[in-house]
């Protein structure tokens, strides 16, 4: 059990670093590099399917059942979906990424025993976009 926990912690730390790179590239206006990091993020989790094309319920089932991801990993995917929305052109695809991100974050927030200010801020920001 210790080896599995250690692997999971290292994977979460690596994914967290990738998310920071995505944010940094997006803020610098380096959209191509940010999109490359997003693809790398999904590759690290062995997600070959296009999550952008999935319906919300289908996405959740895919992440939980098919990929057997935990809430921490799902939360990171929600953060990446939000960034994909930020990088998308204004329109329906932007809102679709934001909807998926909000839905996943809301699910994690409901099920989590830990309060996360970062999660609450992301939920509030997404709610602003969606209203």
Predicted regions, residues:
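N-terminal alpha-helical interaction modules that lie
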Residues: 1-71, 102-107, 125-131
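TPR repeat positional signature
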Residues: 11, 18, 74, 78-81, ...
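Short coil/turn connectors between adjacent alpha-helices in alpha-solenoid helical repeat scaffolds
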Residues: 25-32, 85-97
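Mid-chain, well-packed structural core segment of small domains
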Residues: 68-93
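Amphipathic alpha-helical binding modules
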Residues: 90-131
